[in-house]
């Protein structure tokens, strides 16, 4: 006999893992899952299955269960609520004991919580909507290399959003031509330029050549403008060793910031790079390439607010967070919800903005949200109002598409931003008077006037796919 109390066979998950009377602990990691069970599967069983399969459970009773304390280690589905307006869809709340997770490892946390359970047959679909990271777990992470305040101090830039530009065409330029475009944009008044996320080290432009020409552009623009400038040098590579080699070379060149694609590169690589950046005084810009594969479907996958929280733990000083007004997906309330999760120290539960749990980040620095994708000078008042000062506004085509060239495109964006910040500080309503503010500024800035003329008809108006219930 394996053990006296052992009874072989399959038993319902809800007998062990559905515990509505459970009182959550301050140290538990809490998860809110949107569960769509298969027909005939009751929500209690579905919620319990999620808790089991993402913690200690498996499909049958095993005698080694008797060798440990399941009550101490199991995940528990402690609350279930139907989703309003949806048939057979439920929000299931699961509590995980902290001992299930390795300290300081987003990789391990995700392997458990969003691992095999997402392929589970009893569920038609499953989406992780939000996580509550307890302070005791948060304190095991370094988090962002520097954070918002240290970045402002390094750059000596206060009281306004920062301006960026992604260099286009994203692929095909030689390193010297690329560096020239960087110089022109920085010289015209931008704070940053950016490697596109898919610029790594391709045959037409090897990484080392790009780094050298971009560094030259930065130093030249700094000398001419008296402002600190940066270019997000993409260190993403095929191996962690190669990624670190690129980051080290960037530091040797004396540039202020590097960049990483954190989802395609992976959380382990990202956390290593973030640690290096803090130790060596480099800022870290994070691109979220591949996020929509994970977060765009409303009933399956993982919401971006979870990916944003994971990034704050893993480490990054900037992250792309949608624009609300440009060409890429992002509903206003939802976007502002995870923008607050990135920047603020303490965020109250607020279901109207998709925030399922109160989150306390204790001592973790904040992350600057980056608005990028299909934005131009006419969007500047809305962006300034929506995102406030602690943000990076990135105009790729909206700089390089200027009819007079790159530097005048940068001038137009800087003038528009300064005009919006000045108007806001004078108490004007950017939402209502935005167009007028831009028109007034364009009277004394021919560069802005030309930009206004080119983009006056451009709109990206489609319904957001991911909306609040």
From Swiss-Prot:
Catalytic residues of the enzyme: 168, 287
PANTHER family: RIBULOSE BISPHOSPHATE CARBOXYLASE, RIBULOSE BISPHOSPHATE CARBOXYLASE LARGE CHAIN
Gene Ontology molecular function: magnesium ion binding; monooxygenase activity; ribulose-bisphosphate carboxylase activity
Top enzyme category: lyase
Annotated source species: Pachira aquatica
Catalytic activity: 2 (2R)-3-phosphoglycerate + 2 H(+) = D-ribulose 1,5-bisphosphate + CO2 + H2O; D-ribulose 1,5-bisphosphate + O2 = 2-phosphoglycolate + (2R)-3-phosphoglycerate + 2 H(+)
Protein name listed in UniProt: Ribulose bisphosphate carboxylase large chain
The gene coding this protein: rbcL
Site-annotated residues for Transition state stabilizer: 327
Miscellaneous information on this protein: The basic functional RuBisCO is composed of a large chain homodimer in a 'head-to-tail' conformation. In form I RuBisCO this homodimer is arranged in a barrel-like tetramer with the small subunits forming a tetrameric 'cap' on each end of the 'barrel'.
Family: Belongs to the RuBisCO large chain family. Type I subfamily.
Cofactor note: Binds 1 Mg(2+) ion per subunit.
List of residues that carry N6,N6,N6-trimethyllysine: 7
InterPro entries for the chain: RuBisCO (IPR033966), RuBisCo_large_chain_AS (IPR020878), RuBisCO_lsu_C (IPR000685), RuBisCO_lsu_C_sf (IPR036376), RuBisCO_lsu_fd_N (IPR017443), RuBisCO_lsu_N_sf (IPR036422), RuBisCO_lsuI (IPR020888)
Alphabetical list of NCBIfam families matching this protein: PRK04208.1
EC numbers: 4.1.1.39
Binding site for Mg(2+): 194, 196-197
Binding of substrate, residues: 116, 166, 170, 288, 320, 372
């Amino acid at each position: 006999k394996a053990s006296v109390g052992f009874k072989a066979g399959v038993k319902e998950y809800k007998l062990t893992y559905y515990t509505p009377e459970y009182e959550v602990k301050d140290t538990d990691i809490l998860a809110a899952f949107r569960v769509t069970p298969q027909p005939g599967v009751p929500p209690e069983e579905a919620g319990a299955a999620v808790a089991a399969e993402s913690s200690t459970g498996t499909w049958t009773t095993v005698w080694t269960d008797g060798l440990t304390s399941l009550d101490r280690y199991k995940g528990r589905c402690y609350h279930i609520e139907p989703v309003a307006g949806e048939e057979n869809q439920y929000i299931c709340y699961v509590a995980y004991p902290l001992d299930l997770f390795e300290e300081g490892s987003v990789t391990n946390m995700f392997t458990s919580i969003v691992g095999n359970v997402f392929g589970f047959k009893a569920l038609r679909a499953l989406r992780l909507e939000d996580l509550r990271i307890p302070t005791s777990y948060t304190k095991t992470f370094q988090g962002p290399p520097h954070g918002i305040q240290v970045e402002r101090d390094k750059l000596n830039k206060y009281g306004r959003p920062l301006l960026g530009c992604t260099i286009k065409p994203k692929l095909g330029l030689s390193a010297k031509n690329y560096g020239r475009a960087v110089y022109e944009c920085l010289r015209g008044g931008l704070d940053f330029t950016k490697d596109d996320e898919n610029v790594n080290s391709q045959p037409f432009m090897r990484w080392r050549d790009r780094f050298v020409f971009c560094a030259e552009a930065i130093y030249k623009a700094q000398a001419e403008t008296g402002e600190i400038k940066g270019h997000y040098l993409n260190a993403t590579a095929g191996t962690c060793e190669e990624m670190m080699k690129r980051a080290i070379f960037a530091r040797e060149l004396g540039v202020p910031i590097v960049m990483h694609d954190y989802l395609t590169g992976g959380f382990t690589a990202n956390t290593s790079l973030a640690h290096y950046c803090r130790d060596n005084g480099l800022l870290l810009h994070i691109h979220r390439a591949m996020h929509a594969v994970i977060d765009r479907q409303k009933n399956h996958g993982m919401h971006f607010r979870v990916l944003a929280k994971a990034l704050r733990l893993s480490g990054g000083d900037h992250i792309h967070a949608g624009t609300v007004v440009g060409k890429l997906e992002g509903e206003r309330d939802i976007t502002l919800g995870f923008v607050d999760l990135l920047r603020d120290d303490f965020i109250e539960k607020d279901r109207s903005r998709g925030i399922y749990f109160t989150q306390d980040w204790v001592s973790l620095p904040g992350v600057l949200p980056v608005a990028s994708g299909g934005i131009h000078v006419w969007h500047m008042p809305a962006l300034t109002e929506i995102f406030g000062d602690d943000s990076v506004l990135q105009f790729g085509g909206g700089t390089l598409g200027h009819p007079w060239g790159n530097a005048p495109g940068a001038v137009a964006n800087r003038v528009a931003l300064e005009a919006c910040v000045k108007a806001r500080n004078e108490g004007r309503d950017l939402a209502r008077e935005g167009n007028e503010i831009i028109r007034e500024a364009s009277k004394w800035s021919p560069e802005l006037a030309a930009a206004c003329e080119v983009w006056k008809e451009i709109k990206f108006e489609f319904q957001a796919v991911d909306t609040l219930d």
